[in-house]
Amino acid sequence: MISYIQQNFKEKISLKEFGEQFHLSEKYISRYFKEHFHITLSQYITHLRLEHAKQLLQDTDTPVTEIAMQSGYQNVSYFIRIFKKHMEFLR
């Protein structure tokens, strides 16, 4: 499951679609993530996306709008807001 998420985090992954992919119930997936990672599936995906974006911002001259898209965000304003919150949390 984790490798699938790590390979596809840039795409939209809903709990329902994820469950269908692995033939698991949404409830089981939610419980699994809470028990093993202490976060939800969507929080895990957000973390992967933001860490990917952070790496691109540090290592490339790619514009923020492009980095947002490459990290799975269609709305640049939302990406910037979430990214700032994530960076403040890490301080």
Stretches with model-predicted labels:
Residues 81-91:
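…primarily DNA-binding HTH/wHTH and HhH modules…
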Residues 21-22, 71:
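Core residues of bacterial helix-turn-helix
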Residues 3, 7, 12-16, 35-77:
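Terminal helix-turn-helix DNA-binding modules in bacterial transcription factors
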